């Protein structure tokens, strides 16, 4: 699997040598060889590639990757250009519109957020096609817990957006009083009406960053139309 190239590399170097990770790597080699696994092997660590450790301002925790063809590309909630926007992301865009007035874009490609310091991290980084949660309990949780712990150690204030029970289970790892946690139900159609809509996470995130002297996030995802990415 591709090795990290930016400032995450030295921070996670030891993690890649731990017995749980070596076991996970062998499991994934066999899975990718014999089944259809998402995302592409070269996209697994995109959350870390697009958002270097030094740049992290916001952590948006997801669960596991989308399990439909062509959707997942290593960023939580994001899909590749040209792929229909999934229901949870539709609801995120609705809340963004109601919160900050951003127009609803024609795509769900969230790389713009990642490049501004929004770490779009799933707690499990791979999945079998058509089988949600199929790689749960295989070792990824240990790895992403370490990522969360490293962000928690940062001196710069960070906002953690914890949507849904799975994400909120990570709250105990966020102990640094400099950071700010915003919790809400998951944006899934099954739970969005129970408090996700109306909780204004985007304006609250920017208010906190501004108060701390950090640049706010430009949350508007632009239309890309027929243009290839």
UniProtKB/Swiss-Prot annotation:
One Gene Ontology biological process: base-excision repair, AP site formation via deaminated base removal
Main location group: cytoplasm
Reaction equation(s) it catalyzes: Hydrolyzes single-stranded DNA or mismatched double-stranded DNA and polynucleotides, releasing free uracil
Enzyme class: hydrolase
Gene Ontology molecular function: uracil DNA N-glycosylase activity
The protein's name in its UniProt record: Uracil-DNA glycosylase
Summary of the function given for this chain in its UniProt record: Excises uracil residues from the DNA which can arise as a result of misincorporation of dUMP residues by DNA polymerase or due to deamination of cytosine.
NCBIfam families per record: PRK05254.1-1 (NF003588), PRK05254.1-2 (NF003589), PRK05254.1-4 (NF003591), PRK05254.1-5 (NF003592), ung (TIGR00628)
UniProtKB keywords: Cytoplasm, DNA damage, DNA repair, Hydrolase
Entry EC number(s): 3.2.2.27
DNA damage recorded as keyword: yes
Name of encoding gene: ung
